[in-house]
């Protein structure tokens, strides 16, 4: 059992760092492999009212990837059956419609019987399942979750941009 807040924080950093995710090509990766980068994790869907966020996520990638931002998009069909397509179809849709160049990962479950990275992320404060498609988790270079942003928060929301810039400068 952990006895102090400091131990708990260290424990959570280790858990997030050691969280295994799977790329669209089937390659298992630990989030810690992205250390020295700031990561924005987003659960995505092709048939959602928030799908247009892909465009601004790509703009974020264009602006901040050279500074160390990595965007990891996890297709998710948990909300209204809004991502029923195969990974090949999803990647094709993202690249042709929105010019997406950031990483598309394997499909996941972000609520209920979750799969990684959401089994871990949903336990970080504020605890609970992802509410809908395009919820965002910002992870710092130290593999610690910095912030969680609701699906309604657009990629160029001033609070999200400020958090990204502070994380990149740390």
Regions found by a protein language model. Name each.
Residues 2-32, 52:
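N-terminal "domain-start" segment that seeds a small globular fold
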Residues 30-32, 62-63, 126-130:
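Surface-exposed acidic, glycine-flexible loop patches that form ligand/cofactor-binding
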Residues 37-38, 46-47, 51-75, 95-98:
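Conserved helix-turn-beta segment immediately C-terminal to the redox Cys motif
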Residues 48-51, 79-82, 155:
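Acidic-and-aromatic substrate-binding clefts and catalytic sites of carbohydrate-active enzymes
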Residues 56-59, 85, 89, 116, ...:
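Extracytoplasmic/secreted proteins, especially bacterial periplasmic and envelope-associated proteins
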Residues 68-85, 101-112:
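Thiol-based oxidoreductase modules, predominantly thioredoxin-like and allied folds used
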Residues 88-133:
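Short, internal strand/loop/helix patches
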Residues 116-170:
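Thiol-/selenol-based redox modules, centered on thioredoxin-like
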């Amino acid at each position: 059992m952990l006895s102090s807040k400091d131990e708990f924080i260290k424990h959570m950093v280790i858990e997030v760092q050691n969280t295994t995710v799977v790329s669209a090509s089937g390659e298992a990766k630990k989030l810690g492999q992205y250390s020295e980068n700031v990561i924005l994790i987003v659960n995505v869907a092709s048939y959602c009212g928030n799908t247009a966020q892909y465009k601004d996520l790509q703009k974020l990638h264009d602006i901040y990837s050279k500074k160390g931002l990595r965007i990891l998009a996890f297709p998710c069909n948990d909300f209204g059956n809004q991502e029923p397509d195969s990974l090949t179809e999803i990647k094709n849709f993202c690249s042709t419609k929105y010019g997406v160049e950031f990483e598309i990962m394997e499909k996941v479950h972000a609520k209920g019987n979750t799969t990684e990275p959401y089994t871990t992320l949903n336990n970080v404060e504020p605890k609970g399942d992802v509410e809908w498609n395009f919820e965002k988790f910002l992870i710092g270079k130290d593999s610690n979750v910095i912030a969680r942003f609701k699906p309604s928060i657009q990629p160029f929301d001033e609070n999200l941009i400020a958090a990204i810039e502070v994380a990149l400068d740390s």
